[in-house]
Amino acid sequence: MKPIVAIVGRPNVGKSTLFNRLTQSRHAIVEDQPGVTRDRLYADTEWNGRTLTLVDTGGIQLDKEGDTIEAHVTRQAELAIREADVIIFVVDVTDGVTAPDLEVADLLRRQRKPVIVAVNKVENLKREDEALEFWALGLEPLINVSAEHGLGTGDLLDAVVAALPDLSEPEPEEGGPVRVAVIGRPNVGKSSLVNAILGEERVIVSDVPGTTRDAIDVLVERGEDKFLLIDTAGMRRKARVEEAVERYSVMRALRAVERAQVVLIVIDAQDGVTEQDQRIAGYAHENGKACIVVVNKWDLIEKDDRTMAKMTEEVRMRLAFMDYAMIHFVSAKTRARVHRLLPLIKEAAANHARRISTRELNDLVREAVALNPPPSDKGRRLKIFYATQPHVSPPGFVFFVNDSELVHFSYQRYLENQLRQTYAFEGTPINLYFRTREKAKLGERPVRVRRVLAGGQTREIRRAARKRSTE
């Protein structure tokens, strides 16, 4: 499970610039104006072999209360602090230690978490001397950086990695419970769905503390089958408490998805698939999880004999990047069709972990090629020598070919469709990789690997030539 690192501080100290520098991106809007970053942004980065999720937050203004935008942003940042494993506290050397800095430092000190003070805009010796003033915050270590110019960011990431806790999640045990995450935007009925599942089954073994801080995992049994509903803390609460948790729960959703085998993506039948639904579904897709789109509040829809088919078409169109996902219609309020969810979850989990023997796989490939030979490209034709399945969860297949550049996306889709038609892969993504073996100099076997991604994009990895053994 990837650790979460929150970048926090008062407004206009360079948090978003630092976020962009550390993630080598332009995710955050950067303007010289306090309060520009109102919503938390997320991006993964890797340093010294560790992958971590960086969170960019809006400026903390503890003197703001009520329903103002500033108060909303501060509450958001405070939630990020509570959920983070390590905190980067950004201050501005040109302003010196301010009263708001001291207030934020006091807030962070109470969290009892690793805090790294990033003294920003330190670009010369004079400012290095001025940065010493920030020892008054009572937090360490202090790292001098210039987010704009990239100075000191390597030292900052070194300090972050050194402070990271071990969040390794044990692999699901064979015969153990299926891990299920329930995600979706606010007010689509996630909490009602969880309660409906629990009420339907009526057999709750226990509330199991999860690895995520303050998370509650609920173990549900149905006959011999076990399901672990991940991180239901806050999801089952009511009224104002539920509203607050729902509104600021994206970080929890990210972690729940990482821990899950199957993800339930809950959407509101009245709204259809929104852009926010697409983004949330993308979290599960990018993590290679088995997915079920749960269309909730179906009882509120006026229906005819085509209503469900039309909604299914809309879901398929709006979530075209995950056309493998199962779709299920429910009413959490009336519990209609909720009883069918656990069997679907069990099926999706089994498909996600499905392995095909090398012999069966190559028989299928030979039949597929005989039925529909690869097209030629400028007189050259793709040849598939053999295939193997190196991993599951999600299933991944490697095809050894004469030249991976000859693999057209349409033929990759054809092979994927043949796999899906022959074997049960409903609900799970499958990855196809194409590996080239080229003619090489004596004693070498260079290998070029090309992965065909959704949408026809390709990613090529050139591996160093491997020496043949001469002994």
UniProtKB/Swiss-Prot annotation:
Residue intervals of the EngA-type G domain:
3-168, 178-353
- Name a biological process GO annotation: ribosome biogenesis
A molecular function (GO) held by this record is: GTP binding
**Domain KH-like, residue spans:** 354-438
Does Transcription appear among the keywords? no
Annotated binding of GTP 1, by residue: 9-16, 56-60, 120-123
Alphabetized, the UniProt keywords read: GTP-binding, Nucleotide-binding, Repeat, Ribosome biogenesis
Q: Which PROSITE patterns match?
A: G_ENGA
Entry binding sites for GTP 2: 184-191, 231-235, 296-299
User: Known InterPro entries for this protein?
Assistant: AAA+_ATPase, G_ENGA, GTP-bd, GTPase_Der, KH_dom-like, KH_dom-like_a/b, P-loop_NTPase, Small_GTP-bd
Pfam families tied to this protein: KH_dom-like, MMR_HSR1
On subunit structure and binding partners, the annotation says: Associates with the 50S ribosomal subunit.
Task: Outline what the protein does.
Answer: GTPase that plays an essential role in the late steps of ribosome biogenesis.
PANTHER family with a match to the protein in the record: GTPASE DER
NCBIfam families this protein is in?
GTPase_EngA, small_GTP
Q: Which family does it belong to?
A: Belongs to the TRAFAC class TrmE-Era-EngA-EngB-Septin-like GTPase superfamily. EngA (Der) GTPase family.
HAMAP family in the record: GTPase_Der (MF_00195)
Q: Mind telling me what this protein is named?
A: GTPase Der
Source organism per entry reads: Symbiobacterium thermophilum (strain DSM 24528 / JCM 14929 / IAM 14863 / T)
Q: Which gene encodes it?
A: der
